[in-house]
């Protein structure tokens, strides 16, 4: 898990779960699954481990950030694991969350390690609300959005801290990036555009 924590953009947890390890885990994890269940135990165990890795990563990075910058943590989980951050509690997804994204100087997205492809919904939520997005590197994010122009991506703990310090001290540039990210989401990720894309992939006319 410590090795995976150091790598961004590629997940190797499942590859390292050899059959011997899966059998050992079977002795401690009991699951009564129907025969029709299509996901292998290797994949389920990989998801479990990736969930734990993500939790460790988020707590560690949020502690680093909150010890160096003013940080508000919106969560229903125990905020005591990030003691230097201010607890913001839970906000309503439709009414309050967009305002949080828009008013925050930097919004941090730390993608679940089990999400190996695709653009995280949270990233679109943030940019769609006009907020500045700082996200871990994801291949699809890097392809669809221009780093340093429409969002900010980091590939290490050090890069996250450096870019956070930079963008907090460059307000005009930060606001311009947030606006360009907002325009890109409006252009490419509206309901109409997504429906058009789905119909196109299904070879149907709009």
Feature annotation, model-predicted:
Residues 52, 76-206:
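Catalytic binding pocket for nucleotide-activated donors in carbohydrate/polymer assembly enzymes
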Residues 1-115, 138-141:
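Nucleotide-sugar donor-binding catalytic core of glycosyltransferases
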